[in-house]
């Protein structure tokens, strides 16, 4: 059974690598949900922490979360957008854990105009995702996880609906403090489109590694994102981060997202492109036995940044 599950996960992860890039929807699913992951560049799938928010990035990491943990998250995003999340888990067997989560993104109220640019009213836009998770320790060091998502989106009077799946694997060596992960996110499709044109899911295949250096407080992380698309430079697939672990309970960290920095470049006064800090992120957290608080700041654009906070409590 374990071998069959492991093989199925690997096969399903390989499918998106053959997919072609196209217009995608539900891109709120790409946003960081864990403040710790956000601090390390926004995409991290390898952190071994008692941090339930990390399951949004890799469902296999659910195996490291304490039983009956409740996690709440909030992020203010660009242009006044707001994103909230919640998750709760239960350990159902010695090696098996389940969880449920919700994500909500609201993009504010906008003017509704006709073809003559006359305002006829206002409309709002929002996205919602409800998910169920299952993780299992295949061996003492290898965990697998799956998340099933039900996603809906509203733009004024228009609505769409989709289903998706995340698949994740994590290998952790506690003796050498190596963590290696592979994840395929948002496999699935639309069941109902806004109009007659169906759009693709934001599929994202990622691989990552984290390593804490012996006898030091430093842990480094490197992730490769969007491995199913190779139409841009290899360097822009990298997300890099470093933690300073001040104690078993306190961390501070920083990261750099190469893709975000490239996408947010603008022309300066000398007509040369620059990211002006876009792609950089910072964060800190305190994780006690039952109470956890993590905070991250991310620079998305020269004129826009984001703050993400997670609060978790073990019941």
Where are these regions (language model features)?
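Positively charged n-region of N-terminal signal peptides that target proteins for export
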Residues: 1-4, 140
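Sec-dependent N-terminal signal peptides
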Residues: 4-14
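Sec/Tat signal peptide C-region and signal peptidase I cleavage site
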Residues: 15-19
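Subset of outer-membrane beta-barrel
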Residues: 20-315
